[in-house]
Amino acid sequence: MFFDKQYIDSSLFILRQFLGKTFPNPPVVALLVEHDKNFKDHKIVSFGITGKSGRPHAEAVAIQNFKFNSRKKYTLYSTLEPCSHKGRGNSCTSEILKSKIHRVVFCLLDPDFRVRGKGLKILKQNGIEVFYGLMEKEAYKIYEGYFFNRIKRRPLVTVKFATSLDGKISKKKNNFSQITNKKSQKYLHIIRSMHDAVLVGSNTVRVDDCILTSRLEGLNHFSPIRVILNRKFDLPKNKKIFKDAKKYRTIIFTEKKNHKKISKKDFEVIEVEKKQFNLKFILEELAKIGVCNLLVEGGAKIFNSFLHSKYCDKIMIFRGNFFIGEQGLDALSSNNDIKKSNLEFNLIALNKFEQDHLEIFEKKRNSLILK
C-alpha cells in the first residue's frame, strides 16, 4: 500500500524515543489504522508502546484501547514481529486474531527463538494479510543491540569518553578533571537513558565518585543498570554509587575468592574465576539478564581493553575546547589511534555543543545481523 511507508516511518520516529526505556524487553511501537476496503479515509485510531518494564506489549495496548467498527477495515503497523508466546499475558498474535484487524505490516522478524517467524506463520494461517520487511534497515539500526543480544549473545557495546584537544582525559593520573561543558554533560544523560547498562572500572568510581544515572527531568526513572569491575572488591563503601544502590540496580564483577567480604546486599555480585577480567564472560553475563545496549564510560584501562578487543561496536568521543599538556593522562594507548584505524571504524556523526565537539564512530560491517 502507498501509505504503509508513511505509517511505518512514523512508528520508527516514535520508537527512537523509547530506546532503553522498556528493559528487559525491546521497545515496540504499534499503530492501528482504520480505513475502508480501498484504503481511503485512512487514519490512526489507536496506538501502543511497550510498557516501562517490558509489559504490556505495544500491539496489545493498541488493540485493547479501541472499540472496532464492523463496517471498517483495520491495518496494524508494528516495528517488530508480533509475539506468539504467552508471557505475563496473552500473545500479541492471539490479541490480533480476536480483533477485527485484517492486515498486519511490520519491519523485522523477531530474532528471539521463541518468536522468529512463528507470529508471521500464525497470522497467515488464520487469514490475516501480512507484509514485512518495510524500512528494514532503518528499523535494524534501532534494534541492533537487541539483535546482538539474541544472535551474538552479547550487548552492542559503545565506548564513550571525553578528552581535551590533545587527547587527555585528566590533568594527571588519579585526578578527576571536568573536560566537557554543561550542554555536553546534559546530552550524556540522554545517552545513558538510551542504554540498558553503563560499565566502569573500579578506579573511575574511586577517583570520580560517579553516580552514573540519568538526571535530566523526565529521564530520572530511566537510569541504566550500573556495572562496576572491581576485582579485589576493595572500593570504599561511602562512595555515592553505593549510597543509592537500592534505588538504582548495581552489579559488581569481582573475584570469587572475595565472597567472604560481601555482606552488603543492596547490590548484585557476579563472581569471576580469573584475576584478569574476561570481557567475553562479562558481556555474556550482561546479555543473560537482558542488556542489549551497553555504554562503557571508563576509565583509560577499560577503554583500551575494549578497543583492543573485538567487542567495541561504537565509539563516542566528547572533545573539550582546550589543551592539557604532556602531564595529562592519555585516553588511548599509542597503538589505539581511532583515526588511524580507518579499516575498522567509520566516522558517522559530528555534533557540536557550544565549544565542545562529539565524534561518533561505528565499526564497519559487511551486512546486517538479521539471522
What are the functions of these language-model segments?
Residues 1-55:
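Flexible, acidic/Gly-rich N-terminal and inter-domain linker regions that tether
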Residues 14, 65, 142-149, 191, ...:
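Residues that form generic nucleotide/phosphate-binding pockets
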Residues 20-24, 120, 134-162:
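Proteins enriched for Cys/Gly/acidic motifs involved in redox and nucleic-acid/cofactor modification
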Residues 32-138, 307:
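Zn2+-dependent cytidine deaminase-like catalytic core
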Residues 34-35, 151-152, 362-364:
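Active-site beta-strand termini and strand-to-loop segments that position acidic
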Residues 108, 143, 173:
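Short, flexible helix/strand-to-coil boundary loops that buttress conserved ligand/catalytic motifs
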